[in-house]
Amino acid sequence: MNGGITPSGYYDNYNTEADTISISEGGNSCGYVQYNSSDFWSGGHCYTLRIKPTALISTPFLFHFLKWKEPDIMALRSGSGLPNIQKKDLSKVCIIVPTLDEQQQLIALLSTFQMKIENEEIFTSNLNKQKQHLLSQMFI
């Protein structure tokens, strides 16, 4: 990841381990929050957050919380030509940390909804492909 919403490319090496949150630092997508489930190369245009094992917050909870706050994070952008988010501004985002048990309950609920959304997106994509195929067959 080097900022942005999708990877800017792929590389057989990495400098950031899996289970990391990245936040796009610059450009039109600055403030975009993403969970990285595999090792990746973190470029200079994203911030990465890795939770220490002794922390009282879990990575999945922090990801869902920051994703919920994403509009507020995006509002931190400054500059007009190539907007960016300054680390000092990002560090001011207030994070509410419930107990670890409450975090786990929230993660279970939110993960269920996330899986439902992903399944609906796949279903919609497949329907669109079928539609395109059927339309192309009508006008041969």
Regions found by a protein language model. Give the residues of each.
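Amphipathic alpha-helical coiled-coil/heptad-repeat segments
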Residues: 92-140
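DNA target-recognition domains and sequence-specific DNA-contacting regions of bacterial/archaeal
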Residues: 1-97
